[in-house]
From Swiss-Prot:
Active site (catalytic residues): C131
Pathway: Aromatic compound metabolism; 3-phenylpropanoate degradation
Residues that, per the record, bind NAD(+): S11, G12, N13, I14, S162, A163, G164, P165, G166, T167, R168, A169, N170, N289
Subunit composition and interactions: Interacts with MhpE.
Keywords from the UniProt entry: Aromatic hydrocarbons catabolism, NAD, Oxidoreductase
Gene expressing this chain: mhpF
GO molecular function terms attached to this record: acetaldehyde dehydrogenase (acetylating) activity; NAD binding
Species of provenance: Escherichia coli O157:H7
Annotated family: Belongs to the acetaldehyde dehydrogenase family.
Any one GO BP annotation for this protein: 3-phenylpropionate catabolic process
Transmembrane segments: none
Enzyme class at the top of the EC tree: oxidoreductase
Catalysed transformations (reactions): acetaldehyde + NAD(+) + CoA = acetyl-CoA + NADH + H(+)
Entry protein name: Acetaldehyde dehydrogenase
Protein EC: 1.2.1.10
Amino acid sequence: MSKRKVAIIGSGNIGTDLMIKILRHDQHLEMAVMVGIDPQSDGLARARRMGVATTHEGVIGLMNMPEFADIDIVFDATSAGAHVKNDAALREAKPDIRLIDLTPAAIGPYCVPVVNLEENVDQLNVNMVTCGGQATIPMVAAVSRVVRVHYAEIIASIASKSAGPGTRANIDEFTETTSRAIEVVGGAAKGKAIIVLNPAEPPLMMRDTVYVLSDEASQDDIEASINEMAEAVQAYVPGYRLKQRVQFEVIPQDKPVNLPGVGQFSGLKTAVWLEVEGAAHYLPAYAGNLDIMTSSALATAEKMAQSLARKAGEAA
């Protein structure tokens, strides 16, 4: 099977890490162009040193390059506002181009590979939610495939050092997009997301807490589903792990809790604690929040490339 050529828009932390992953390991993708807006950026400099074509003129620069004619898939690691413009420009120039959105813009459907990649592999634009979403939504989905979930709340704690300008500029979009994806992909009736930028030195790894309120069900079945889901995520994010055993608490009918926007609740509370260690391809190991985004986007692009090859009649 021939490799599908890809471009990355955004030469910051996420874009650069993604480029290195593709260059080092990928079997189905060929890194063709790195796109930025700062000619002095480290990402563009690294791309040039690694033999990748570059432009510092943004999406317009990409479309003016001869390499653009052969690009099948574009990763966008800019910002939510920029992605809307990038999608419109690329779609006008090449209607069938595939975009993998690593911003909270969410023009296309949310994609969490271990939960719903197969049903979205032929979409022209997919959104990778957020780092917190990629880490925690699989856990919500693991519960919701066993029992009805009324409410899910996630707290994503990431090292402040790992949060670049793009992350900081999109905090509101982070919470909104993640909350919505907890419902749409995770299967919760109501979702809530909180992000914490941890200033600790030395920087700590990404930690995530997931609280799920559901109807009562077999705790063994729920725990087994969660463990199975965690193993599935580890297939493309090796540093993803449960920090401790799943904890349960039964909330009795005569002592319900009040959930804003939901009302009174009684049933089962499931608590999951996660840790995500980065692969340290470009970023430090503590930046698991960025690694899970690039790894999830890469897993999505690989499936897209295989789907495109099948449609073209190529052997896998």
